[in-house]
């Protein structure tokens, strides 16, 4: 058999997911999972799920979950897109928005999946270096490019960029899409959510995996200008209409609706992080 297909993937170095050891009584830190269980409403939704519903295809538009997220974020439903974890959403973003001959810009020390997607989709990219304090330098993103993406807070440095600096990057790149990856925003920093009404080129991506304790459910979402969301849906419906299964959609709605529990768990984690930081300094 000829292997003509190899030329499409032979240069790709795949992302290495975190190990999931099958051992009891282990403190697992390698993939930053939440130590607290999901909201009680999620367990209730699991208990009340009608098995007969599983014979039907799930809602391809994920309307109930989209509406719940939009309401919680103070947005319109047409401004929200959901996917199978933020990795799925981000991969679709690379496919949808980063298709010019100009390089996409993202930090040299950052989420390692960015370069994997760029290589897989043959997207040129450049990786501006962090400064000597491991901070993103906004001015490095003012040059001509085919799009910008960065995490805030950054991973793995855990440093967040002030919203004013985030806006500087967006303001200097209004001809391309700027994606702010906010997987950890609930633990530190200000979300760029308040800027989506001001800039139609801004897309913010978040996840249920960290602050909402649902890494096993795989729910991620993006919000921004309705035209960006429509473009993402056009790509999604071009290859897989049913990306999210019915149980996951139900659990996601239950998680969003229990905002008090979510905030309580986030505060507990932030307090523990603060105590750990104090011990390090001592």
Where are these regions (language model features)?
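N-terminal "arm"/small-domain region of PLP-dependent enzymes with the aminotransferase-like
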Residues: 1-56, 144
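Short glycine-rich anion-binding loops that position phosphate/pyrophosphate groups of nucleotides
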Residues: 32-35, 86-87, 111, 152-156, ...
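Phosphate-binding glycine-rich loop
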Residues: 63-103
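PLP-dependent aminotransferase-like
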Residues: 96-151
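Active-site pre-lysine segment of PLP-dependent enzymes
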Residues: 133-144, 156-178, 182-214
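PLP-dependent aminotransferase class I/II
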Residues: 201-277
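Positively charged, low-complexity/disordered segments
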Residues: 280-282
């Amino acid at each position: 058999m000829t292997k003509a297909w190899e030329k499409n993937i032979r240069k790709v170095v795949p992302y290495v997911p975190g190990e999931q050891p099958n051992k009891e009584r282990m403190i697992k830190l390698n993939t930053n999972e939440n130590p607290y269980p999901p909201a009680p409403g999620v367990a209730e939704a699991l208990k009340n799920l009608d098995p007969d519903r599983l014979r039907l295809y799930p809602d391809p538009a994920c309307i109930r979950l989209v509406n719940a997220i939009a309401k919680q974020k103070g947005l319109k439903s047409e401004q929200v897109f959901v996917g199978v974890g933020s990795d799925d959403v981000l991969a679709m973003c690379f496919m949808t928005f980063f298709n010019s001959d100009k390089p996409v810009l993202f930090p040299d020390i950052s989420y390692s999946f960015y370069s994997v997607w760029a290589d897989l989709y043959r997207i040129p990219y450049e990786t501006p270096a962090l400064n000597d304090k491991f901070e993103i330098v906004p001015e490095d993103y003012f040059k001509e490019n085919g799009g910008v993406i960065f995490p805030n807070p950054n991973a793995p440095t855990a440093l967040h960029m002030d919203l004013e600096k985030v806006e500087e990057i967006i303001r200097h790149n209004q001809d391309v899409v700027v994606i702010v990856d906010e997987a950890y925003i609930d633990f530190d920093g200000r979300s760029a959510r308040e800027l989506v009404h001001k800039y139609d080129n801004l897309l913010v991506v978040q996840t249920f995996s960290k602050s909402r304790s649902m890494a096993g459910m795989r729910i991620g979402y993006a919000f921004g200008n309705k035209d960006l969301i429509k473009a993402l849906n056009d790509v999604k419906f071009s290859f897989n209409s049913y990306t999210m299964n019915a149980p996951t959609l139900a659990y996601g709605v239950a998680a969003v609706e229990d905002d008090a529990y979510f905030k309580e768990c986030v505060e507990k984690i932030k307090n523990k992080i603060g105590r750990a930081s104090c011990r390090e300094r001592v």
